[in-house]
């Protein structure tokens, strides 16, 4: 495409979304597989202190959200903390954030697809169906962000309505024995590990920050959307946790791979749980693919990933190549990861991403801050503690992937790429 003067025009992203659209896309990313799968490993880790883990994860998520909103107001561009980190801290911290987001969220997407399939088909069909779901939703994302936003609105509305009915049915069904409600106390480390695993369920608000080039009036809309979205999700997760503890107890949650389905039992509401889980997982997967693709595009613009991934499709205004590569990477993880491994691996990458987010926000000048410096410092410290508390397999896998990423960037710089 060229101008009348014969100059080549490079297609770019377009500002088509309002605050409501951004909130819905963020909710679609947060009300996902975490609601239906993260409580089990978190209850196994935290035991009777599951609610303490939830409060801790919520507090750190709040600090991260404030830092994300503050940075988005100053740097309304695609890439989220990858872009913010480069501007505030320099290219290497920015790369670490971007790599953490791409790797961690790719694992999140694999977890979403596996959760969707787990709730809809028998065991032998889980991975094939998860593969098909990824292929279809990558295709939807490639058609444009307005289609992504429309799909998110439908999915989020349906999931919230279904969950309201399911929670009422569960509460009417009875209560857990006192010893199941009390559970076992696994100590401070268990609380921290539980919070780290539950953080997987909150981290979708990062998707809103990656919309910097597609939201109208981003300096105002993105901070508002992040705050509204996180507030809704914290209330929802607290309600679900309280209901599950009341009906199953923390011991019962830890023993069930599908705690909401177990709480419903064989009642008429079981299909509603399955439909809600499927829709929520698909909604999160839809939002994740778009967010990862845009961060990969931003990294490719700076030569931190292959330059070809920076291309924007002239008709659909989407980073088509980046999203296709992201889709392929998700399929690889589905082939080799189980759900629990994907959740732990995702938490590692995303917590590192938010560690850089909080440090960047704390370094901003006073006139750019939306909150006190100590909030960013506390958020960074919280992320560091939760990373160190994750399961050993997640920590080792995360360190290996970051070593690969840092080696890749160092090699590109040395070769002049």
Residue ranges and their predicted role:
Residues 41-44, 53, 62-142, 147, ...:
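Hydrophobic transmembrane alpha-helices that form the core helical bundles
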Residues 1-38, 45-49, 61-62, 66, ...:
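Membrane-interface "cap" regions at the ends of multi-pass membrane proteins
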Residues 305-313, 355-371, 416:
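Alpha-helical transmembrane segments
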Residues 3-4, 9-13, 51, 124, ...:
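Helix-loop-helix junctions that connect adjacent transmembrane segments
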Residues 349, 362-417:
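A generic transmembrane alpha-helix motif of multi-pass inner-membrane proteins
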Residues 83-84, 90, 122, 227-289, ...:
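TM-loop-TM module centered on a large, flexible mid-protein loop between adjacent transmembrane helices
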Residues 45-48, 76-80, 87-93, 213-223, ...:
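Juxtamembrane helix-boundary/capping and inter-helix hinge elements in multi-pass membrane proteins
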Residues 55, 59-63, 103, 131-139, ...:
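Generic alpha-helical transmembrane segments of integral inner-membrane proteins
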């Amino acid at each position: 495409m060229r101008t009348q003067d014969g100059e080549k025009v490079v297609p770019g992203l377009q500002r088509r979304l309002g605050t409501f659209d951004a909130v819905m896309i963020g909710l679609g990313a947060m009300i996902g597989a975490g609601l239906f799968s993260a409580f089990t490993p978190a209850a196994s880790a935290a035991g009777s202190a599951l609610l303490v883990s939830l409060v801790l994860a919520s507090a750190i998520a709040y600090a991260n959200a404030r830092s994300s909103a503050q940075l988005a107001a100053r740097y309304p561009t695609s890439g989220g903390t990858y872009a913010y980190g480069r501007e505030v801290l320099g290219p290497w911290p920015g790369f670490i954030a971007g790599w953490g987001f791409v790797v961690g969220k790719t694992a999140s997407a694999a977890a979403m697809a596996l959760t969707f399939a787990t709730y809809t088909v028998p065991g032998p069909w889980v991975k094939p169906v998860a593969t098909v779901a990824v292929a279809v939703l990558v295709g939807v994302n490639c058609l444009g962000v307005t289609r992504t936003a429309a799909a998110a609105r439908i999915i989020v509305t349906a999931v919230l309505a279904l969950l309201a009915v399911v929670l009422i049915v569960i509460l009417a069904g009875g209560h857990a024995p006192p010893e199941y409600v009390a559970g076992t106390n696994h100590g401070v480390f268990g609380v921290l590990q539980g919070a780290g695993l539950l953080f997987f369920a909150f981290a979708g608000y990062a998707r809103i920050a990656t919309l910097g080039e597609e939201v109208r009036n981003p300096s105002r809309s993105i901070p508002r959307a992040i705050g509204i979205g996180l507030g809704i999700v914290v209330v929802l997760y607290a309600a679900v946790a309280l209901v599950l503890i009341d009906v199953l107890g923390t011991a019962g949650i830890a023993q069930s791979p599908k705690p909401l389905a177990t709480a419903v039992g064989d009642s008429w509401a079981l299909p509603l749980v399955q439909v809600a889980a499927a829709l929520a997982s698909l909604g999160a997967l839809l939002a994740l693919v778009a967010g990862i693709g845009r961060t990969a595009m931003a990294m490719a613009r700076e030569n931190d990933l292959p330059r070809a991934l920076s291309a924007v499709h002239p008709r659909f205004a989407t980073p088509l190549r980046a999203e296709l590569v992201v889709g392929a990477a998700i399929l690889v993880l589905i082939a080799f990861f189980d759900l629990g491994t994907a959740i732990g691996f995702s938490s590692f990458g995303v917590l590192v991403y938010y560690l850089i987010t909080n440090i960047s926000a704390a370094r901003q000048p006073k006139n750019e801050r939306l909150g006190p410096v100590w909030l960013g410092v506390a958020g960074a410290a919280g992320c560091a503690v939760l990373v160190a508390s994750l399961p050993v397999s997640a920590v080792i896998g995360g360190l290996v992937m970051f070593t690969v990423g840092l080696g890749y960037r160092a090699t590109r710089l040395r070769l002049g790429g």
